[in-house]
Structures are given as structure tokens and as C-alpha cells.
Amino acid sequence: VTIPVTLSYHSSGLKPKERSGVAGTGWTLNLEPSVSRHINGVADDEYREGWFYVADEQVPWQPDKQMEFYEKKVNNGTDMRPDKFIYKLPQGGGSGYFRTRHTPMWTVPRNNDLVKWNYDDTMNITDENGLQYYFGGTCEKTGDNITRWLCSSICSARHPEQQLVNFYYD
């Protein structure tokens, strides 16, 4: 397994109160595989208000009940959009959305990677070559919400119990 180390620059300009990263302002050190989450509204896993809890609610068929349904959603601050997830692997990556925590990510555009979110707030990705990536243990948070999962290990496609690469963070 080869882990490329690259540096990328984002010329979005300086923003007030934006902190400089380890590589400097506007620069990103691309080192380890990771999964990032862009929270749309409320975090998907936020109890009773997040996408996982409200996505299956049925919209009433009567027009007056529909207005009441949507007004309740807006006024109570319940989530109307799923969070976007972006993952980075040594030989690629992708993005997508989870319909529920129980089903694999729907990648957009579609690819052959299998991305799963586990009950213990860890994630697993199996790439199209069968390599397995485990994320969790070390995470970045905004408030109480995880916004980035860092890779803990990469395992062989033929021998999943054999760890090829382990990542340790301070």
C-alpha cells in the first residue's frame, strides 16, 4: 500500500477568524485517508432532529396538512437535508449521502466503493480493489458533532485480520 503525501492550495481568500492549518493559510497537507462531513442544517445523527430520525416521515396527501407538516418542520428546526460526506483514500475517494445509518452511503457520482457508518460512530470503507479502511478512534469535532474521521488502519483484501498500515495520532 502506498500512501501519497501531497500539498494543495485553496485560493478562496482569507476569512475573518479562520485559523491557519499545519501547512499554512490556504494550504492543506494531504496525508492520511479521512472522511469529512459537511453538516446541512442539523447533524444527521442528532437525536430526534437529524436526518436519520426525520427522513422517513411521510408527507400528508391533503394540501392543508402538507402546509402544516412543512411549517412544523421549519419552525421546530428539524433537518430537511442529509449531510454530505467526502472521503479521501490513497488512490482516490468520493462523496455521497447516507439515507439511514443502517445502509451504505449513496456515492455521487456512483462508484464501487462501499462506505458504512457503524453504530459506535466509526466508519469502514472497502475500495474497488478490496482494501479495507477503518476510521474512528480519532475524530475532529465541531461542538458535539463529528466532522472528520481519521483512518486508524488499512487491511488486506485477502486477509482482513492482517493490518497493512496503522495510523497513530497525538
Predicted region positions:
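Conserved binding/catalytic microenvironments
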Residues: 162
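Solenoidal tandem-repeat scaffolds enriched in leucines and small polar residues
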Residues: 166-170
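Long, intrinsically disordered, low-complexity, charged/polar and glycine-rich segments
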Residues: 1-152, 156-159
